[in-house]
Amino acid sequence: AQANLTTSLTNFSEGETIYEVMTGKTAQLPVLEVNEKLHLVPASLTLAMVDVELSTAMARESILKDVLERANVSGNYDFVLLDCPPSLGLMTLNAFTASTDIIIPLVSEVLPFKGLTMINDFISMVHNKLNPNAHISGVLITRWEGSKLSKGIELKLREALGDTVFKVKIRKNIRLAEAPLENKNIVD
């Protein structure tokens, strides 16, 4: 609901987004070509309203799955990444219902680490009731620094989850945070 990928990867400012498709305002899934190998369905801040707008919709947890199936997304792409908001609301429920492999990005800090159990329980519920193909394929440590805190969180994650924690970590990088301010996408 924050549209961070759209902001970070494109100069998109106007036009239809995933919000209009999910709320039935348009049928065609809008796709932007970021580069030859990366396409993006844009989002905007209006996506934050989708939880309210779809709160009474029938089968609201599978709207995104239906949208992606109608657009034959799995037939047209090798990988589809669904960037979820940092909450367990309707958008995240829709993404998990439409997914098979779920990667959990986890900031190497104490509070996100403590929330991992709730995310795991949420995915288990989706797996048991809505999508038997949904499972955690890995945990990706993000904003990692060589600090005692980051190392401690990584150690605890590896003790608790073993090989589910990816070996690769995304280091904290101020240039990534500055890129949208300078109107640069992070791919270039």
Q: Which residues fall in each region the model found?
A:
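P-loop NTP-binding core
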Residues: 1-188
